UniProtKB/Swiss-Prot annotation:
GO biological process terms, semicolon-separated: removal of superoxide radicals; response to oxidative stress; UV protection
Gene: Sod3
Hydrolase is among the record's keywords: no
Glycoprotein keyword on record: yes
Protein species of origin: Drosophila melanogaster
Name of protein: Extracellular superoxide dismutase [Cu-Zn]
Length: 181
């Protein structure tokens, strides 16, 4: 297990060094897809992550379709495993073992990216910046899973027992693995 960690860290350092040498941003992408629903809709699309320099903020572009109108929890999960669908991705990426929170909260999982809001036609096309995630290094997200949830994330502020663990965001309706672009 330790060998895999060392190899992963070395790979991330190499990617970061190569990108800086060429003065290019590091990019990663995840193609998300969910099961076909009873109304014949299917959540699908992609999430692109761009980091201009190692250690700087990550720009996130989300383009999805097939959602129900409203807010949906959006998280990085600890594993990039699709063996048993989205459930194989494990819990939210939380290396610091802290409570769930919102993207602008001081205390949050690394993977807590808040909510995405689908319009009346079920489309999300949004770009924003996250100050906690990184593509490389100790907290790098490359190779991890990204998940869109059925319900709105309560950002750890709700009274439900799942609030401090998952934001009570409900089931996983689409997921993908983050890979280097």
């Amino acid at each position: 297990m330790m060998q895999y960690l060392v190899v992963s860290l070395a790979l991330c350092a190499t990617i970061c060094s190569a990108a800086q040498t060429r003065n290019m941003p590091i990019q990663a992408i995840a193609y998300l897809i969910g099961p076909v629903q009873s109304d014949n809709t299917q959540v699908k699309g992609n999430v692109t992550f761009t980091q201009n320099d190692c250690g700087q903020n990550v720009h996130v572009r989300v383009q999805l379709e097939g959602l129900k109108e409203g807010k949906h929890g959006f998280h990085i999960h600890e594993k990039g495993d699709l063996t048993n669908g989205c459930i194989s991705m494990g819990a939210h990426y939380n290396p610091d073992k802290v409570d769930h929170g919102g993207p602008d909260h001081e205390v949050r999982h690394v993977g807590d990216l808040g909510n995405l809001e689908a319009n009346s036609t079920g489309i999300i096309d949004v770009t924003y910046t996250d100050q906690v995630i990184t593509l490389t290094g100790k907290l790098g997200i490359i190779g991890r899973g990204v998940v869109v949830h059925e319900l709105e994330d309560d950002l750890g502020l709700g009274n439900h027992t799942d609030s401090k663990k998952t934001g009570n965001a409900g089931g996983r309706i689409a997921c993908g693995v983050i890979g280097i672009k």
